[in-house]
């Protein structure tokens, strides 16, 4: 992780005293870092959340996200459309309309810093996202309702296998790989076994002529074994737990009768990058179509700090 500016307690006061007068006029912004989809710190997917980001410009938010170097960083602002708060989500390079683990992690931080509510509506660029918070004996469980699933184009299994580096016979032929969105686009690729999942490598991508039809990430889902496990690999990195993608997977599982409507499914992700995660999903069925996708998990504190600008 790149340089961070942490100032806290006596050490922070001493550091401030040593700064030039111009620097002492800068403002500190507190953040809370949490791990999402786990009950254990240093597992799951990390998120830095700024619970009071008023006064930060767009450029500063982007620069902070780049400095912290997480997959996403969130900034909480006053609500503008009737929700509980406006939430802006930044990757290291751009603002995102929606992301799963940042939504859950931000709701957790809000529950810690603004206690008293068991449900929240977060205003994100994709629209309002409803979140519930449940204080359980073993930790805080947070669950969001994602946008209604949209099912897109189906992909040719041989094309996928050739492009992504495994045999076509390793795709679960009972189900067609398909684009699904519950706020973000993902191509769901059903695999027969965890052994295929384990040998996937970074750097594979679809041919250029296929990328327009299948935008977004490729989410590998083991459908041929009782325990569902997943991976999301990019060109240079792997995501340890992907709330937006697992919502699409939930819709896919119910739509294809792999799991029953409203069955809560525990899905594993992240063990191949030493960040084991458990994502809990469920989806309903109405008029022959998957609906009411919910994604949840536990969230835990990791650390707190102050960013000075």
Regions found by a protein language model. Give the residues of each.
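Active-site proximal loop and beta-alpha junction motif in alpha/beta enzyme cores
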Residues: 2-98, 104-309
């Amino acid at each position: 992780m790149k340089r961070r500016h942490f100032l806290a307690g006596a050490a922070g006061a001493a550091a401030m005293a040593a700064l030039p007068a111009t620097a002492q006029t800068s403002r500190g912004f507190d953040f809370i870092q949490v791990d999402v989809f786990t009950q254990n710190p240093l597992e799951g997917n990390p998120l830095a959340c700024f619970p009071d980001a008023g006064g930060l410009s767009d450029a500063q938010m982007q620069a902070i996200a780049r400095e912290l170097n997480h997959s996403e960083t969130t900034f909480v602002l006053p609500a503008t459309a009737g929700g509980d708060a406006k939430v802006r989500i930044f990757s290291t390079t751009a603002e995102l309309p929606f992301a799963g683990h940042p939504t859950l992690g931000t709701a957790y931080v809000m529950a810690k810093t603004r206690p008293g509510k068991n449900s929240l509506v977060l205003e994100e660029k994709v629209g309002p996202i409803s979140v519930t918070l449940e204080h359980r004996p073993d930790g805080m469980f947070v669950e969001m309702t994602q946008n209604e699933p949209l099912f897109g184009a189906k992909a040719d299994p041989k094309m996928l296998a050739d492009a992504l580096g495994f045999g076509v016979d390793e795709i679960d032929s009972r189900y067609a790989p398909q684009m699904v969105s519950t706020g973000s686009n993902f191509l769901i690729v059903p695999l027969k076994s965890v052994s295929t999942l384990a040998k996937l490598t970074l750097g594979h991508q679809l041919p250029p002529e296929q990328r327009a039809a299948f935008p977004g990430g490729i989410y590998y889902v083991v459908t041929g074994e009782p325990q569902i496990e997943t991976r999301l690999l990019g060109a240079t990195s792997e995501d340890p737990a992907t709330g937006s993608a697992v919502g699409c997977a939930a819709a896919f599982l119910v739509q294809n009768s792999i799991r029953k409507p409203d069955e809560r499914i525990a899905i594993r992700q992240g063990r191949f990058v030493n960040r084991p995660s458990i994502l809990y999903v469920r989806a309903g069925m109405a008029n022959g179509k998957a609906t009411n996708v919910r994604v949840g998990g536990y969230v835990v504190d990791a650390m707190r700090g102050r960013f000075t600008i």
